[in-house]
């Protein structure tokens, strides 16, 4: 089961060693350890662009992982892969599933907004103004939520919200 990791840099090597130590010393069940191992292997495959392998590992981790918080990150990473492959509808589904389990995932909120913004741009190019407005408004809604959770992040989104007049109800604005 364990994926052979290249660990070309110090941080990756350190993470792998620490993760292995934590797995050995924490009082966790066999299933929890196995789920984490699949998750770690999924992250490794994903970082190397091996998306099919990453998805296999994430799906195995989902079968075993019971903790909602941990499941939210697995779902988020699955969404990342689908978004990277241009499968935006599937990506949105997984981001939303992750948010149902953990509403404090600003990166998922941001990525949902990015997809809606992209769809808004596509609608403009197709001269579908009504759809573009709807998509841009949805993007604004999700960016506002992300910014509320992580006010120092998403500067480009904050600038876009300001320049388009969509900055609303965010503390300090």
From Swiss-Prot:
Top-rank taxon, per record: Eukaryota
Q: Does the keyword Chloroplast apply?
A: yes
Q: Which GO terms describe its biological process?
A: photosynthesis
The listed locations are: Plastid, Chloroplast thylakoid membrane
The answer on whether this UniProt entry bears the keyword Plastid reads yes
Gene3D superfamilies recorded for this chain? Tetratricopeptide repeat domain (1.25.40.10)
S-S bonds: none
* PROSITE patterns tied to this protein: TPR, TPR_REGION
Alphabetical UniProt keywords:
Chloroplast, Membrane, Photosynthesis, Plastid, Repeat, Thylakoid, TPR repeat
| Membrane-related topology note | Peripheral membrane protein
TPR repeats mapped onto the chain:
35-68, 72-105, 120-153
Q: Name one GO cellular component term.
A: chloroplast thylakoid membrane
HAMAP family in alphabetical order:
Ycf3 (MF_00439)
Similarity remark: Belongs to the Ycf3 family.
Q: What does this protein do?
A: Essential for the assembly of the photosystem I (PSI) complex. May act as a chaperone-like factor to guide the assembly of the PSI subunits.
The entry's protein name is Photosystem I assembly protein Ycf3
Tell me which species this is from. Answer: Porphyra purpurea
Q: What is the lineage of its organism?
A: Eukaryota, Rhodophyta, Bangiophyceae, Bangiales, Bangiaceae
């Amino acid at each position: 089961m364990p994926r052979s990791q290249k660990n070309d840099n110090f941080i990756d090597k350190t993470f792998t060693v620490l993760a292995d130590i934590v797995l050995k010393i924490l009082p966790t069940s066999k299933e929890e350890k196995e789920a984490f191992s699949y998750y770690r292997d999924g992250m490794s495959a994903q970082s190397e662009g091996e998306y099919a392998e990453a998805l296999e590992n994430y799906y195995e981790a989902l079968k075993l992982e019971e903790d909602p918080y941990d499941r939210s990150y697995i779902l988020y990473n699955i969404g990342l892969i689908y978004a990277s492959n241009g499968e935006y509808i599937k990506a949105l589904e997984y981001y939303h599933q992750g948010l149902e389990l953990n509403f404090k995932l600003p990166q998922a909120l941001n990525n949902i907004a990015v997809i809606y913004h992209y769809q808004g741009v596509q609608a403009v190019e197709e001269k579908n103004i009504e759809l573009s407005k709807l998509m841009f408004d949805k993007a604004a809604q999700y960016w506002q939520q992300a910014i509320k959770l992580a006010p120092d992040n998403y500067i480009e989104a904050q600038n876009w919200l300001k320049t388009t007049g969509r900055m609303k109800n965010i503390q300090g604005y």
